[in-house]
Amino acid sequence: MKKQNNLRSLAAQAVEQVVEQGQSLSNVLPPLQQKVADKDKALLQELCFGVLRTLSQLEWLINKLMSRPMTGKQRTVHYLIMVGFYQLLYTRVPPHAALAETVEGAVSIKRPQLKGLINGVLRQFQRQQETLLNEFATSDARFLHPGWLVKRLQNAYPTQWQRIIEANNQRPPMWLRVNRTHHTRDGWLGLLEDAGMKGYPHPDYPDAVRLETPAPVHALPGFAEGWVTVQDASAQGCAVFLAPQNGEHILDLCSAPGGKTTHILEVAPEADVLAVDIDEQRLSRVYDNLKRLGMKATVKQGDGRYPAQWCGEQQFDRILLDAPCSATGVIRRHPDIKWLRRDRDIVELAQLQAEILDAVWPRLKPGGTLVYATCSVLPEENRDQIKTFLQRTPDAALSETGTPDQPGQQNLPGGEEGDGFFYAKLIKK
């Protein structure tokens, strides 16, 4: 089997599993990448991410160019045609190669009889491309987001929703966190320059560096030795607001994959940290991160709603709750989120967040700090959540972040800045 020929069909199968079966791309893609040569892995990733980023447009084009949708066992061909459109619109793959390889993909998915159909649709698109794209530019699909999410963003951000959508449709910058126990940020930036790369410090987060051009981690000075970690700037804000101190008992709840756990220990190496997550499989990445950075923490599997099951009656000086959320602030990194989430999920997530907040608040010592964080931009999960929590929790007070009417700090995704993130810093009276 020609691996190069198979690339397009693998991408089509990955997108189908996300859209039709509700699988996350981070679970679907790695096993498929094992089926292609190393030199082809980047292209496979680009095709999967790109098709999911522009899915609304590609779906719109198929509806314009085909009289009826592909269904049943032929459904993968629907996504194979999308992969073809994406290459013609957004990649440097020569058009003749894009067509030939995509058409050949029908053989890999055991649909060789549909090669002529695929070829015909792609060539029809080439002939009508300018007219079709002009029409698309005035359609509702042009936002590249599901309609329910566009409406929620319009309601929440009447003057900024388009900026958020544009940011979500861009490729994300690559942010790093310099391990302050090994190097100062300026010192590591010097090592980066010596390696022929350039980075820029974040003005607000003292460990954050943005690479001018994304690079593989093995090319970063000292990555294997734990000198630096890949972590978005906004995610680094969690430890900044938490302000952990040596000797404190700290709970990092919903901790996987461990980026925030290790950041806490970089800021306060002698803190006693308990990292808890409900997903046992993802906890393996917490262990991996601790090992790479040479750090120690207690790691437990547990549900945030039932702290007695994983910490008994223990109380903590500080709690970081990176709550389960819609992840609508990190769509540019995970474009599958747009198609995995449903409108009804938001109410269910807000209810879960409230239950976890109420369950862990008694575990915070008087005078202690709880930082509530999400990678969402939706008020129901953020400001509204904290506002109602403050109303029902008389011993909770807001600190540093916002006002009682507008509690918390909301970062919006954009350009070279960090992802969409929300933080609220609460003090126990």
Swiss-Prot record:
Gene3D superfamilies tied to this protein: Helix hairpin bin (1.10.287.730), NusB-like (1.10.940.10), Sun protein, domain 3 (3.30.70.1170), Vaccinia Virus protein VP39 (3.40.50.150)
What the entry lists under InterPro entries is as follows:
MeTrfase_RsmB-F_NOP2_cat (IPR049560), MeTrfase_RsmB-F_NOP2_dom (IPR001678), NusB-like_sf (IPR035926), NusB_RsmB_TIM44 (IPR006027), RCMT (IPR023267), rRNA_ssu_MeTfrase_B (IPR004573), rRNA_ssu_MeTfrase_B_ent (IPR023541), RsmB-like_ferredoxin (IPR054728)
Q: Please provide, in alphabetical order, the Gene Ontology terms of the cellular component aspect for this entry.
A: cytosol
Keyword Repeat in record: no
Where primarily located? cytoplasm
Instruction: Give any single GO term for biological process.
Output: rRNA base methylation
Annotated positions binding S-adenosyl-L-methionine: 254-260, 277, 303, 322
* Keywords linked to the UniProt accession: Cytoplasm, Methyltransferase, RNA-binding, rRNA processing, S-adenosyl-L-methionine, Transferase
Catalytic positions are 375
Q: Does the keyword Lyase apply?
A: no
List localization entries.
Cytoplasm
Q: What class of enzyme is it?
A: transferase
Q: Mind listing the GO molecular function terms for this protein? A: RNA binding; rRNA (cytosine-C5-)-methyltransferase activity
Q: Give the catalytic activity.
A: cytidine(967) in 16S rRNA + S-adenosyl-L-methionine = 5-methylcytidine(967) in 16S rRNA + S-adenosyl-L-homocysteine + H(+)
**Sequence ranges of Polar residues compositional bias:** 400-412
Q: What does this protein do?
A: Specifically methylates the cytosine at position 967 (m5C967) of 16S rRNA.
In which family does this protein belong, per the annotation? Belongs to the class I-like SAM-binding methyltransferase superfamily. RsmB/NOP family.
Q: What is this protein called?
A: Ribosomal RNA small subunit methyltransferase B
As recorded in Swiss-Prot or TrEMBL, the protein's gene is named rsmB
